Amino acid sequence: MWPQPYLPPHPMMLEESRQNKLAAAKKKLKEYQQRKSPGIPAGAKTKKKKTDSSPETTTSGGGHSPGDSQYQELAVALESSSVTINQLNENIESLKQQKKQVEHQLEEAKKTNNEIHKAQMEQLETINILTLEKADLKTTLYHTKRAARHFEEESKDLAGRLQYSLQRIQELERALSAVSTQQQEEDRSSSCREAVLQRRLQQTIKERALLNAHVTQVTESLKQVQLERDEYAKHIKGERARWQERMWKMSVEARTLKEEKKRDIHRIQELERSLSELKNQMAEPPSLAPPAVTSVVEQLQDEAKHLRQEVEGLEGKLQSQVENNQALSLLSKEQKQRLQEQEEMLREQEAQRVREQERLCEQNERLREQQKTLQEQGERLRKQEQRLRKQEERLRKEEERLQKQEKRLWDQEERLWKKEERLQKQEERLALSQNHKLDKQLAEPQCSFEDLNNEKKSALQLEQQVKELQEKLDEEHLEAASQRNQQLETQLSLVALPGEGDGGQHLDSEEEEAPRPTPNIPEDLESREATSSFMDLPKEKADGTEQVERRELGFVQPSGVTDGMRESFTVYESQGAVPNTRHQEMEDVIRLAQKEEEMKVKLLELQELVLPLVGNHEGHGKFLIAAQNPADEPTPGAPAPQELGAAGEQDDFYEVSLDNNVEPAPGAAREGSPHDNPPVQQIVQLSPVMQDT
């Protein structure tokens, strides 16, 4: 069995173990601090007991002698001292327990310190191992740098996309009409991005699963290779033992053969000596030798031949054994080379396995980083979608608000059209009635003179009452404008004021909506709109002043007409009933009738203006105080109640005016009765005069 290489622990595992140990140490420190902190003192209850028992002693001491009171005080003092002693004993015991706990905690802290020291030693070992793996990490750093560059490029692309999305959001905020289409496009793009992200996630999950499967396959193959290596090593060890035994046997046989060879060589040498001696003897002069000697010589020669043959056989055996030994040595060398090659292959496989594991770890880290980036991108897209949805809701609310405003404007226009139709009908009716009256006046000129005198009086009364109403309306407009300015300065928001309208038809709607209270500030309005509305306030003030001046001109015109009527009356009285001037007088009468119609229309408009002012304006009390002074004191030239008509006729006229004009606000329905408001009473008093004329 070859020794397996020591693999270092993963740095992430080391960091996790370190963090876990630090968290455990922090928890122990917190527990130690909590135990060390002093608890609630037990003397509070005793103090309460003292306070509870003190009134009893005082009450009981009121009826006894001073000696008893001193005795009781001493008893109380003894009780309090005993209680304090008990408390001190309890505190001592608690301090002892705390001391034990502190000692126990110190022991635990020592243990934790030892564990930390061991962990530090392990970390030092891992650092040494990591220094050995520095060469491999350089290659991984190169790959990580390339990946970081790639991620930087992707981050730049994402930053550009974010800028583009911000520009799109600004465009959405600017234009309401283009928001819907752009929003649909962005929804489509976001859905496409989500689909792409989901595909990427699925691909990464699949790749991760494939990598895990590949890792499992590699680990299984490594296990199989290790098993095969172990089996092959066992087989090689067995063969080595066999070859060693055979080599030992062969070496033993070679030694025995060498010894036999030496013996044979020694015998051969002895035989050669003996042969040489015999040859020498044979070389001597022949003598009669016995046959025994010849036979001995022949035997010796045969033995020598036999020995030579044995020596030759032994030499062949030796050569064959040497050749076998050489072949065995070659085989052993080849087997050693094979074993070395296999060991190198196994080492290379182990190194490849380590590299593959490192590469898989790097790939897993990259996949985790990609998943994190994808999750961050998804969160960003979700946040963008939420922002866009909020903006859509705001835009929808603004659209709804604009639609409501449009509906209100349409309703106001419809009301104005209805008013115009009603006024036209009233004008037609008045024209018909005036034509009938003119016919009667032509038939009876004397009655016409009396009527003209009455009209003159009524015109003077109208002038005075119109002036008073004009002053009151001016005060009302100024108060309303000042209140509106104060509210706008405090709130710094947009006040929804009605438009100027087209011509004289929309003046009534402007004057009706002018004194209404300011609406609540909408939350969706931007600061630019608020500042622009605040800068437009002087323009609105100027428009209000122009409207007041127009009304003043409208009220000044009937006064001029009455002056003309007076002049015509003086001329008529000076000339008398001349037939040539009758035609001019009739023309003057017609003109007066037209001016009276205009006065009636303006009075109706004033009535429509005053009713919402009285009902909805916040400074109604000031208006009543300013209006009750002329109501209590009769003005010079004002007609008596008998001349103006009965109260029933006034009520009838009030009901007709409300039916024919705009419906009053709920505040006007509560507070706008003609008997409670002096300006309304004056307008109602003017109405029967106009009916009489």
Swiss-Prot record:
It holds the Pfam family GOLGA2L5. Residues 537-547 have a biased composition (Basic and acidic residues). GO terms for cellular component: cis-Golgi network; Golgi cis cisterna; Golgi cisterna membrane. The keyword Transport does not apply. Residues 20-71, 497-547, 629-693 are annotated as: Disordered. Disulfide bonds: none annotated. Keywords: Coiled coil. Residues 679-693 have a biased composition (Polar residues). InterPro entries: GOLGA_cons_dom, Golgin_A. Belongs to the GOLGA6 family. PANTHER family: GOLGIN SUBFAMILY A MEMBER 6A-RELATED (PTHR10881:SF44), GOLGIN SUBFAMILY A MEMBER-RELATED (PTHR10881). This is Golgin subfamily A member 6C. It comes from Homo sapiens (Human).
